[in-house]
A protein has these predicted regions:
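Helix N-cap at the beta1-alpha1 junction of Rossmann-like dinucleotide-binding domains, i.e.
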Residues: 72-75, 170
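A glycine-rich helix->loop->beta "capping" turn
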Residues: 40-41, 82-86, 96-125, 140, ...
């Protein structure tokens, strides 16, 4: 009788054990193993790069307020509504029209914290962004300029801002991830870097 009792208890124990999930392992950073998560504060972002859908979506998914420029008015407006961004139509991707679009965004939002631009426009856009921000009532303590291009452009130093270059070879998601990385508050010390995506 005692043997039968122990067998039944062991079967109940084995059935309960099979139904239980393994304990959830946590890494030292507090995340699940194999997952790295960052807290990304809500930022105001201007993307002045043609065909930067992956970058726009990455910042929208991170909870940022995003404005982007484009020449296709109907397609740009539809895309903006789909991802939750603001579309600013421009006639062409030249420094003058992009700076005017950036001024409109700055007037509406009162500040732009992150600027994503191409290497060819970087000097003009960065200079215009600095001018717009210098007119703010309080000096901003955070700012990022991320330059995307096939080759790096020379950019003058910017106080209280980080400038990084990403040299891309048609790898949209890799470029978008690098842009998010450089825009993190913890990456303020990373300055003047060139990242080549292979």
């Amino acid at each position: 009788m005692a043997d039968n009792y122990l067998e039944k208890k062991f079967e109940e124990y084995a059935a309960a054990k099979a139904g239980r999930r393994a304990p959830h392992r946590i890494s030292p950073a507090g995340n699940r193993q194999g997952v790295v998560e960052f807290k990304f504060p809500r930022r105001r972002v201007v993307v002045a790069v043609p065909d930067a859908d992956a970058v726009i979506e990455a910042f929208c998914n991170a909870g940022c307020q995003v404005a982007f420029c484009g020449t296709d008015i109907d397609g740009g407006q539809a895309y903006a509504e789909a991802v939750g961004a603001q579309f600013n139509p421009v006639n062409e991707f030249c420094a003058e029209t992009l700076c005017r679009a950036m001024s409109r965004v700055m007037k509406a939002w009162r500040d732009i914290e992150i600027v994503i631009c191409t290497a060819g426009m970087a000097q003009a856009i960065t200079s215009h962004w600095r001018t717009l921000r210098s007119a703010l009532p309080m000096e901003p303590d955070y700012g990022r300029v991320v330059v995307i291009g096939s080759e790096t452009a020379e950019i003058p130093a910017i106080p209280n801002a980080t400038v990084n270059d990403i040299v891309c070879r048609d790898i949209n998601n890799a470029v978008a991830s690098a842009c998010l990385f450089f825009a993190l508050p913890e990456c303020g010390a990373v300055s003047g870097q060139t990242i080549s995506t292979l």
